[in-house]
Amino acid sequence: KKGLLPVPTSASTPTAAVIGAGFAGLATAALLAREGYEVTVFERLNAVGGRAGEETFDGFRFDMGPSWYLMPDAFDHFFALFGYRTEELLDLVPLDPAYRLFPECQAPLDVPADPARAATLFESIEPGAGAKLTEYLDSAERTYDLALRHFLYTTFSSPAAFLAPEVRAGYADLAKFLTTPLDRFVARRFSDVRLRQMLTYPAVFLSSHPSKTPSLYHLMSHTDLTQGVRYPLGGFAAVVDAIYRIAREQGVRFRLGTEVTAITHSGGRATGVRLSLIHI
């Protein structure tokens, strides 16, 4: 029955309600359960995956949401927390070319899957741009590695991440990256619109615009032009299934077809969720 919350197994067990069974909800639920929480996920739709849906037409399956598998080390890290290697759960195929750019009123461009060939492409379009791309990607890699080591896996519950010697040594660069928008950062180095488009599109992944995105995120060019773009066989539904499997193995409960309309609270703390039919 919609709105019926499972009875906790123990009064001493901490509980958590996760709203939404997209990538973030599934991963959060699995991690909370791993920490000992009794977790229930509430999802308005009748399937998990959120925006990572798929449709079938004439026997062909199509991803309706994400279609690029980037930052493989982040996925590797997550799966390893639960004792899995990524290759045990997913069959990933490197894409070459990584993707195809369709500039307005110009011929399409195939973007190579490695930095050396990408530099050759840049040079063929704009003399001098090949060497500039190599420098750009070197900076992107350094920034990416710094973010991975000190920022990606921290809760920022203390300023410790900002006080690490490596981070302090890069304060000047970080200040520049945080105060210069991505479009201006790229425009200072490249003139051709197509090259700028290749390097500023990551702002889309942040639901932003290059003019409003800090150039810190030029680190994203490391993920597609250096690490390369991968695609999971079976589509992104396969990635959803892998994380969903882990969450269930951790004991997470799922309430599909259940819409949360409000979070109740008292004294500054969340106390429950209000469902579309009744209040739990």
Locations of regions flagged by a protein language model:
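N-terminal glycine-rich phosphate/pyrophosphate-binding loop and immediately adjacent elements
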Residues: 13-146
